[in-house]
């Protein structure tokens, strides 16, 4: 079983209906390579085809979880969480520009072995 995940700072061609980028845009290079040259599956896209789910406040999906097929068969659900976690918070010390735990939404994956 293999998994690769994180902030790729790139976008998936599968989401281009949202972005409207030219087909030769370099923003696709990372995911084009992963999808064309590795056994990894974009699990959020596979489980929610056509249902764009942003992973950042800016409205892009740049955080991904990729898995090989054997591990993907163990996935029961996967989703990007938009409730609760990114809610504004206050720092009692008055630190400025520190109002969110992250500028990315968490991705939750449930696996069953």
Regions found by a protein language model. Name each.
Residues 1-3, 10-113:
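Metal-dependent phosphoester-hydrolase catalytic domains
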